[in-house]
């Protein structure tokens, strides 16, 4: 089948007849305009006048709306189901009204809460103390009466009542106990005071760490540090002596001069009145054992023949001197 083309369609000169593409957009030219559609007027009144949505003109004929109600399938209770997350909020509100209500805070509960927690101000900061967790260790600090003239308080710190470091919540207990000791010290002290540190009968696992003792010293108010006249350590151990020797460069020379070591309760009674000082039974027993060992050691030295001969030689030399 032969296809005839018009002359010049496939000729090279036909390309010259093609329109050239535009080099720029014609911004000033005519553009097709958009056609605006106008919505018909609808009467939204509730009467059945002409044009109203309730007018009979919008209803179908009776033949078109003839529906047999008996033939309609209606869901029964078995077909009904609930969508999760789409419960009736009013029903939930009525059913959970009692569970969501806030119980009344009685006066007894308020007193109990005050017994469990104490709010104190230390270093211009408000702190809360868990009184329940430190209840077994509150005897660690006590008031030992007064000395001299005026209200010069004696504060007794019994290390034997400190918590055991093997506790799982040891750091939490020591943190609250630290706040309790500092706040109690501020309440007990009115003027000058001294601290009696009972170190005897305290195992190593109950000894406070260096960081805890340093923190206590730093958190004590400047007034309390200034009014502290003496820090007496009863039954000092090698460990407590080492701690004080290590911390000496970090504390003031004035505080170091206030530290005194006492080896027995009898020696302590010669320094301060003991009438109001409560000494734990474990420390009394510890002091008796140490006193007995000291007396035995002293008697052994006097009964030693070598010591007796040495004393005689010293006496002879002293007599020979003019």
Swiss-Prot record:
Pfam families: BNIP2, CRAL_TRIO_2. It comes from Rattus norvegicus (Rat). Keywords: Apoptosis, Cytoplasm. It is found in: Cytoplasm. SUPFAM superfamilies: CRAL/TRIO domain. Residues 57-80 have a biased composition (Acidic residues). Residues 130-291 form the CRAL-TRIO domain. This is Protein prune homolog 2. May play an important role in regulating differentiation, survival and aggressiveness of the tumor cells. Residues 40-52 have a biased composition (Polar residues). PANTHER family: BNIP - RELATED, PROTEIN PRUNE HOMOLOG 2. Residues 1-110 are annotated as: Disordered. Transmembrane segments: none annotated. GO terms for cellular component: cytoplasm; glutamatergic synapse; presynapse. GO terms for biological process: apoptotic process.
